[in-house]
Amino acid sequence: MTDAIFVSKAGADRRRGLLDWLLILSLPLLMIAMELGVYAFEPRVLSLRNIVNVLNQSSYLVLFASAQMMVILTRGFDLSLGTTVSAISVASALVMTGLAAAGAPDFVLVAAGLIVGLGFGALVGLFNGFFVSWLGINPFVVTLGSLNICLGLATTISGGRPVFNVPDVFSLLFYNGVLIPGLSIPLMIAILVCLGLYFLLNHTVFGRSLYLIGNNPRAAYLAGLPSKRFLGLAYLACSLLAAFGALMLTARTGSGEPNLGGSLMLESIAAAVIGGVSLQGGVGGVGAVIMGTLFVTMLSNSMDLLEVGGYIQQILLGCVIIVAIFLDRLRLTRG
Amino acid sequence: MSSLDVHPAPSHRLYRAYARFGFLPTVLVILVVALALFVPRFLTVQNIFNVLRSSAYLVILSAGQMTVLIVGGFDLSVGAVVPLASVVSALVMVWAKGVAPDQTAIIVLLGVLAGIGSGLAVGLINGLSVAFLKVSPFIVTLGSLSIATGVALLLTNGIPVYGMPQAYVNGFGRGLWLQLPTAVYLAALIVALVWFIQNFTRMGRYLYAIGGNLQAATVSGVRTRTYLVLAYLFCSVLAAVSGLALTAQIGSGQAVISAQLTLESIAAAVIAGVSLKGGVGRVEMVTLAAFFLLILTDAMDLLKIDPRIQTIFLGCIVVLAVALDEVAKRRASVD
């Protein structure tokens, strides 16, 4: 099965014309053009400091977009991602501040935060995965339900207020500590996660199966793949990645925020789709997610530097999403 | 399933008829009786009045959402069309009042036309993209959601627009006909219209055919593209109408109206048994489901349940309703 996918890919390569290459390179070319265009008005955009800044900012979104990709590959999506992030941020912050107040040592604080955060993520993932794969319910409905549940939990357990005083050791470990000089911890984590995901998607049965499940669920079933289990696992992986991102964001803000995930659901889907992960399932990868994330982050960074207002940024992001899906459509029909 | 086999034929037929309507009417009746018995303030005139009025907006919105779901689509942008229509109509009315202060009829007419026009514009973008460029409705409407929200905020800077003619606010928005809010009549009229279209017109049959099997509909000579565009236009126009009615009640144009509108409209449709795969859905059931959701919300308000916990509850109900529906359908198909 793995071979079949590679063979068909190689076959398509041979027939690629100039237009196909332009379509494949459209996003990188667009990014370069955008940065050069902005440079003409605002030279700071290409300064080392700004580039490092963009990379650091991207390291959070890339996690959420990869999470989203895991389920989009199987023709699903996860609407609950944003509110899951909020709920995890609040829950882990509450546990850590509570333990810190009780005088627990640092390693206990961090371990408790991680366990609560990842455990909560696993619960959400199992909930989504159970209803989508075993009961065969549309992912839109299931994750719409868990969106509301997590939103309710995030605001209830925090009383709607931020949870301050997350222990410094947690922020040190996941945000502002220095392990390798010149490389921020979030960026390092993002790189490691991307490498891990690349391996998972390309060199394991589970990863390859996700593509087949998305491409042709019936064929996957007939091929004898444990489709239900893999589909459920995809949702679990999605929520775990989101949980990890939530913990990193909590470390950055230094507080548990009930509104932390506000726009993350839309941004994560947008980044994945702009990068070329197809909502029809079975198309996409870590590279696509990285490109999409960089594009979205660069766009908002450029507009911030040019002092474009937030409302216009929102309109432009909408336009970009629509244009990206047109390009995706062109790529698919030509492929 | 096995218990059904031993039943004689007539009760089997009864069960079939019951299954056709689903469990929603039963649940609704039980809910209303239980509330009437146990929650004293539920059966007061004021409370019924409130439930009817707030249901009216959701009924209008969900009827539109249902139309798009029937053709196998999605419309995430309704939640942004409501505030957009609100802002545009209010701005146009304020402008027209400045030009010709005495011509109330013309001022209101211009405002209403502009509001509906803004809905038409969004619907046209959605419909054309889905029908002619064949891109995923999820992404297109995600894009137009972002664009419409941005435009509404840009036009007003997020500040409410006051100064609409009093006749519009007091006569239409807060007015009563035969003791009932005008919005209730508007909703009833729209439901009747949609019901008529669904049951007695060629367009209604075609919409089901397109959602059931796009290919088959095209081959049978249905102009699928035209009808797809019409479905999206219809949905956006209904969202705009809902926005106009809300604006008249609030008395000002608002760029920020409940963010949950899109999700609520989809939840109502889904609880009513509208299939997200297309081809299935009836407006009378959607109306009942909208009532169901708002009666439930109202009951929780009366019981002084924290709105945050209500969110969790609603999330569970959406998932459970669909899970039950799915299980029932499987039984029916085994039968």
What are these regions (language model features)?
Chain B
Residues 98-145, 288-292:
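Alpha-helical transmembrane segments within multi-pass membrane transporters and channels
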Residues 14-56, 244, 248-253:
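Helix-loop-helix hairpins and the membrane-proximal interhelical loops
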Residues 16, 133, 138-200, 227-230, ...:
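Transmembrane helix-bundle core of multi-pass membrane transporters
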Residues 33-38, 43-97, 101, 128-135, ...:
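Single transmembrane alpha-helix segments in multi-pass membrane proteins
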Residues 239, 249-315:
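Transmembrane alpha-helical segments in multi-pass inner-membrane proteins
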